């Protein structure tokens, strides 16, 4: 009897101690409303108070779409209006709770001030970048126009030399060789009417090659002797140059000297 009494006392003491301890309270939840952008449905969501400053994932019961909701941003009215979640922010301050959520969270003002301080430099930087872009837009357009103008300018002088060249070709005086060949062909045909033009041209070319004084501008009276040429008519006739040949050679030499000095002979 003496040994069993303390045991019963201890059991009774434990049972009384368990009865005195209150049952664990369920975690308090806040009823919030989330708008589903996919099916345009308002969802009633119970968010634990410990997760009010976190980003939670909500599954829509109507379309099974997953929504990522930032509860920290919804606490600010400005963030709630920008995120189109104003009903959710109003639900946090709804009269269902005995007192507002802002009263339950005394450290709420600190995040708000930090977020406003962080937002103001971002806004100022965005406005400054927009203004700088607006100021630089006319400068870039003017620079591009100047570059296009400089690219088009070099194309104009390219066409000018070609026009000058064509005019020079049109105004060019026949060379001494051409004048000599022309006069020589006429002389050979006059002396031998039966000769062909091809044979006369060949004979004129040989005459030009056999008289170097024509190339160097020498006059025929400087000790050169008369030579004969053989025509290409197959008869093997030998023709001697007359005074007209020397006159033509002298005229060709004079034309060559005048053209080298830049003076038109005729």
UniProtKB/Swiss-Prot annotation:
Which species is listed as the source?
Oryza sativa subsp. japonica
Q: Which family does it belong to?
A: Belongs to the YABBY family.
One Gene Ontology cellular component annotation? Answer: nucleus
Q: What is this protein called?
A: Protein YABBY 5
Q: Which domain of life is it from?
A: Eukaryota
What Gene3D superfamilies does the record tag this protein with?
Answer: High mobility group box domain (1.10.30.10)
Ranges annotated as C4-type zinc finger: 36-63
Q: In which tissues is it expressed?
A: Expressed in leaf primordia, young leaves, floret meristems, floral organ primordia, stamens and carpels. Does not show polar expression pattern.
Instruction: Cite the GO molecular-function annotations of the record.
Output: zinc ion binding
**Organism phylogeny:** Eukaryota, Viridiplantae, Streptophyta, Embryophyta, Tracheophyta
Residue ranges annotated as compositionally biased, kind Polar residues, are 142-165
- Localization of this protein: Nucleus
């Amino acid at each position: 009897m003496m040994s069993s009494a303390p045991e019963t006392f201890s059991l009774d003491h434990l049972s009384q101690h368990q009865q005195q301890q209150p049952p664990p309270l369920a975690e308090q939840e806040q009823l919030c409303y989330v708008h589903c952008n996919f099916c345009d449905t308002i969802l009633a969501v119970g968010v634990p108070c410990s997760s009010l400053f976190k980003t939670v994932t909500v599954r829509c019961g109507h379309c099974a779409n997953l929504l990522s909701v930032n509860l920290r941003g919804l606490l600010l009215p400005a963030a709630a209006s920008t995120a189109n979640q104003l009903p959710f922010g109003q639900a946090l301050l709804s009269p269902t709770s005995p007192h507002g959520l802002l009263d339950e969270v005394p450290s709420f003002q600190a995040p708000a001030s930090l977020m406003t301080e962080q937002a103001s430099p971002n806004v100022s930087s965005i406005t400054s970048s927009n203004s700088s872009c607006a100021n630089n837009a006319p400068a870039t357009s003017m620079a591009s126009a100047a570059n296009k103008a400089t690219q088009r300018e070099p194309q104009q002088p390219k066409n000018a030399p070609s026009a000058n060249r064509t005019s020079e070709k049109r105004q060019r005086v026949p060379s001494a060789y051409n004048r000599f060949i022309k006069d020589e062909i006429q002389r050979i045909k006059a002396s031998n009417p039966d000769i062909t033009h091809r044979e006369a041209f060949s004979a004129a070319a040989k005459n030009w090659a056999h008289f170097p004084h024509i190339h160097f501008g020498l006059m025929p009276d400087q000790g050169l002797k008369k030579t004969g040429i053989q025509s290409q008519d197959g008869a093997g006739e030998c023709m001697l140059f007359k005074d007209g040949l020397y006159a033509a050679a002298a005229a060709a030499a004079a034309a060559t000297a005048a053209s080298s000095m830049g003076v038109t002979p005729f």
